[in-house]
Amino acid sequence: MTTIAKILAREILDSRGNPTLEAEVTLADGSFGRAAVPSGASTGTKEAVELRDGDKTRYLGKGVRKAVENVNGTIAETLKDFDAADQQGLDRRLIDLDGTENKGRLGANALLGVSLAAAHAVAASRKQPLWQYLSTITESDVALPVPMMNIINGGAHADNNVDFQEFMVLPVGCSSFSEALRAGTEIFHSLKSVLKGHGLSTAVGDEGGFAPDFRSNVEALDTILEAIGKAGYTAGEDILLGLDVASSEFYDNGKYNLVGENKRLTSEQFVDFLADWVAQYPIISIEDGLAEDDWAGWKLLTDRVGKKVQLVGDDLFVTNPKIFKEGIDSGTANAILIKVNQIGTLTETLEAIAMAHAANYASIVSHRSGETEDTTIADIAVATTATQIKTGSLCRSDRVAKYNQLLRIEQALGSGARYAGRDAFVSLKR
């Protein structure tokens, strides 16, 4: 039986040493599921509320005991004997129980932990891996996603002078996920050698990418191209580039303040700046190219390069189906980043991905800068045919755990395993 017998939460630590919530759901048949909730550094203002205690004498105010108490009290009592196999019904009960638009009463971290743990428990009850169980919910084919590997960190993810938050490599020319992972790993180690050769730091940021000081943002791109070549791959063929500009972080009074470039640019000027990069480098994806409130600028960027580059809304859409619909209706961006903790339940996450598929927008399942060993997002990416996954660099076990889970899934699928490769960019095939 898949009725809920017990729900339990606790406070654990994430990869940045901050508290986060872990939830467990036990079913009447003894089946068990566990999930840990991630946390972001650069966050959209419209994200669901991550409930923190605010007690400065404990974990500098970042404790999550209130959220834990909400799970162990109100949520556990309400969901006792509920059928966890009814994922939509369970998530609707959680949303109604919170009763706020942004999940601020009980906390999105409380709701999400239970929502994901319940799915794990039902998968265990059915003796299925999570990806297989989720694919029955989504009624979707399965595919191994292209990894967007963040090998240089800047912005809010690193203590350096690089304005842009992530510089990524995408191994699109590989025939399998395992080969793509190998390519990314070889480029990562090649990049370390190149940085050392240039006398630059090889310290890593929150997501495992290197975080050196460069003379300019464009030097990061040039250094990556050098590393790709040194590793024996061809940029523009085997490997494409991606950026997470995270421009809301340096958008101030209507201007984009690029400290590393010593420039303050209007929306029009910044669109020109990005378009010039697209013309010069094999860039296939730009995330948060404009600030989350600069919808006019987003439209300019979409009109300018949206037919040849994937334009990903993260802070812009915050995995929220209501906000995402506004973007679809206005033709803004052409892809959405999917972060489970931005919206707070599995059902709403799957709804956002389904909306993307229906509108011919690409969907990219993503980690957060504060992660754990939890690998749920790997299963979600496969089960929804999301075609791309962002889960950091090729070091730090909190990032590599997701890659290793994808290797396991690929092996389990055997001859039925399909790697998205160049077909990942669905929004560019219109």
From Swiss-Prot:
Q: Which GO terms fall under biological process for this protein?
A: glycolytic process
Q: In which pathway does it act?
A: Carbohydrate degradation; glycolysis; pyruvate from D-glyceraldehyde 3-phosphate: step 4/5
Which annotated residues bind (2R)-2-phosphoglycerate? 165, 339, 368-369, 390
Gene3D superfamilies documented for this protein? Enolase-like C-terminal domain (3.20.20.120), Enolase-like, N-terminal domain (3.30.390.10)
Q: Please list which residues make up the signal peptide.
A: none
What cellular component GO annotations does this protein have? cell surface; extracellular region; phosphopyruvate hydratase complex
Which reaction does this chain catalyze? (2R)-2-phosphoglycerate = phosphoenolpyruvate + H2O
User: Is Lyase one of the keywords?
Assistant: yes
Q: Where does Mg(2+) bind?
A: 244, 287, 314
Recall the GO molecular function terms of this protein's record.
magnesium ion binding; phosphopyruvate hydratase activity
EC category: lyase
- E.C. designation(s): 4.2.1.11
Listed A to Z, the keywords are:
Cytoplasm, Glycolysis, Lyase, Magnesium, Metal-binding, Secreted
Required co-factor(s) are:
Mg(2+)
Q: Does the keyword Chaperone apply?
A: no
Task: Tell me where in or outside the cell this protein is found.
Answer: Cytoplasm; Secreted; Cell surface
Q: Which residues of this protein are catalytic? A: 207 (proton donor), 339 (proton acceptor)
Q: Which InterPro entries match?
A: Enolase, Enolase-like_C_sf, Enolase-like_N, Enolase_C, Enolase_CS, Enolase_N
The note on the cofactor says: Binds a second Mg(2+) ion via substrate during catalysis.
SUPFAM superfamilies from the xrefs? Answer: Enolase C-terminal domain-like, Enolase N-terminal domain-like
Provide the assembly information. Component of the RNA degradosome, a multiprotein complex involved in RNA processing and mRNA degradation.
Function, in words: Catalyzes the reversible conversion of 2-phosphoglycerate (2-PG) into phosphoenolpyruvate (PEP). It is essential for the degradation of carbohydrates via glycolysis.
Q: Which family does it belong to?
A: Belongs to the enolase family.
Question: What is this protein called in UniProt?
Answer: Enolase
Point out the gene that encodes the protein: eno
